[in-house]
């Protein structure tokens, strides 16, 4: 992809060659256990300010249904979808991600 330079790709290849990808795979292997460990949170709401920031072309959005976030995010909530960005939005569009984060944080009131 145009957002990943050859140098960055070489870095990832070197690191995964050195360390393997067990950590990343274990996240998926442990998914059922994660649901079990967080079962007590079913129905809980988020009252702290929350920002949902994603790429509008992220295929995960198809089953995640971010439009339902306001059912659980009952405090101040903002959603930002970056057009044309995919799953790795922070790598694909770092300046826009940082700008959205800073804008969100600046809008918070200190308590």
PLM ranges: what are they?
Residues 1-53, 57-60:
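Alpha/beta-hydrolase
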Residues 24, 62-66, 93:
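Residues at alpha-helix caps and immediate loop-helix transition turns in enzyme cores, especially N-
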Residues 32, 44, 48, 70, ...:
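Solvent-exposed, non-transmembrane amphipathic alpha-helical segments
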Residues 43-44, 51-85:
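Conserved loop-alpha-helix segment in the C-terminal half of the alpha/beta-hydrolase fold
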Residues 75-111:
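Catalytic active-site module of serine/aspartate enzymes centered on a nucleophile-bearing elbow/loop
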């Amino acid at each position: 992809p145009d957002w990943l330079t050859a140098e960055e790709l070489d870095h990832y290849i070197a690191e995964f060659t050195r360390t393997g990808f067990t950590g990343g795979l274990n996240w998926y292997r442990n998914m059922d256990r994660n649901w079990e460990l967080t079962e007590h949170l079913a129905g809980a709401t988020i009252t702290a300010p929350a920002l949902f920031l994603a790429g509008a072309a992220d295929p995960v959005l198809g089953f995640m249904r971010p439009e339902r976030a306001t059912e659980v995010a009952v405090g101040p909530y903002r959603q930002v979808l970056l057009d044309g960005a995919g799953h790795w939005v922070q790598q694909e569009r770092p300046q826009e991600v940082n700008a959205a984060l800073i804008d969100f944080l600046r809008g918070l009131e200190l308590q």
